[in-house]
Swiss-Prot record:
SUPFAM superfamilies linked: Carbonic anhydrase
Cofactor requirements of the protein: Zn(2+)
Residues bound to substrate: T235, T236
Protein name (database record): Carbonic anhydrase 5B, mitochondrial
CC per GO annotation: cytoplasm; mitochondrion
Gene Ontology biological-process entries: response to bacterium
Family matches, as InterPro entries: CA_dom (IPR001148), CA_dom_sf (IPR036398), Carbonic_anhydrase_a-class (IPR023561), Carbonic_anhydrase_a-class_CS (IPR018338)
Sites where the protein binds Zn(2+): H130, H132, H155
Gene source species: Rattus norvegicus
A molecular-function term among this protein's GO annotations: carbonate dehydratase activity
Keyword Zinc in annotation: yes
PROSITE patterns assigned to the protein according to its UniProt record, in alphabetical order: ALPHA_CA_1 (PS00162), ALPHA_CA_2 (PS51144)
Length: 317
């Protein structure tokens, strides 16, 4: 995910760059395991996206994101509540290319667009949403499930306005942020997403911004309420371990042409040598000692056949 919402002008207004530190990083991206056949033979020895050049990859944390979610290892928690989502379309402000993704930002001075319930103790205000995607449809998501990649992943970023005065403060502290992750898979055309796609040509270059009013991002959510949750971090600098992740089990369908429009965006500003905005995801991080909890029972999800109780006529005397 990216928290680069107030990061346009200087470090003073940047919740992402406040803690950036310079040091050496490998120029090659490690191989990312993937169960899709197209991922088994591909190489990932590409130059890092501009955001990661000359920056620390891991700040010695043990709750880093993204992770590979192992379905059978996740723990069903009956105490997890349903997630309640209430977004006011009128709070949508604009869409912009921040040089790493495209963000749709929202007015967040009041509780007009919030989530509550689920694993959360407080209401969290919607700040922005953005996507991560690959150079082709075989990969692109930040999280994986049983090592399976999806073509793209949506992140809806919320902050805890009960405990913190600002998004910038919340982004650096434990339990400061709640991010809903939604996988995108190839399928039918997504009508609501098309409104976003139609706007992308106007923000092709880095640091371009246009107004984008009256949009309810809940239309990008799957209908299934099931989710996984775990404690993690931002996936862009400063990589703060401030995030309660809520990863939706069910992906949403988009078509190939819509994803291709994502790939027309550029990491670079107008006048610079063009560099396509693709593969803007962080490599997988180790789970360490964390537990991934699920809001659903595994026997239902994995279609395990449960033997029915014997009828009275079948019971031996």
């Amino acid at each position: 995910m990216t928290v680069m919402s107030h990061l346009r002008v200087s470090l003073q207004v940047s919740s992402c760059t406040l803690l950036w530190r310079r040091f050496r990083v490998p120029r090659l991206v490690p191989l990312r395991s993937c169960s899709l056949y197209t991922c088994t033979y591909r190489t990932r020895n590409r130059a890092l996206p501009p955001l990661w050049e000359n920056l620390d990859l891991v700040p010695a944390g043990d709750r880093q994101s993204p992770i590979n979610i192992r379905w059978r290892d996740s723990v069903y928690d009956p105490g997890l509540k349903p997630l309640t989502i209430s977004y006011d379309p009128a709070t949508c402000l604009h869409i912009w290319n921040n040089g790493y993704s495209f963000l749709v930002e929202f007015e967040d001075t009041t509780d007009k667009s919030v989530i509550e319930g689920g694993p959360l103790e407080h209401n969290y205000r919607l700040k922005q949403f953005h996507f991560h995607w690959g150079a082709i449809d075989a990969w692109g998501s930040e999280h994986t499930v049983d090592s399976k990649c999806y073509p793209a992943e949506l992140h809806l970023v919320h902050w805890n306005a009960v405990k913190f005065e600002s998004f910038e403060d919340a982004a650096l502290e434990e339990n400061g942020l709640a991010v809903i992750g939604v996988f995108l898979k190839l399928g039918k055309h997504h009508k609501e997403l098309q409104k976003l796609v139609d706007t992308l040509p106007s923000i092709k270059h880095k640091d371009t911004l246009v107004k984008f009013g009256s949009f309810d991002p809940s239309c990008l959510m799957p209908t299934c309420p099931d989710y996984w949750t775990y404690s993690g971090s931002l996936t862009t600098p400063p990589l703060s371990e401030s995030v309660t992740w809520i990863i939706k089990k069910q992906p949403v369908e988009v078509d190939h042409d819509q994803l291709e429009q994502f790939r027309t965006l550029l990491f670079t500003s107008e006048g610079e040598k063009e560099k396509r905005m693709v593969d803007n995801f962080r490599p997988l991080q180790p789970l360490m000692n964390r537990t991934v909890r699920s809001s659903f029972r595994h026997d239902y999800v994995l279609n395990i056949q449960v033997k029915p109780e014997p009828t009275a006529s079948e019971v031996s005397p």
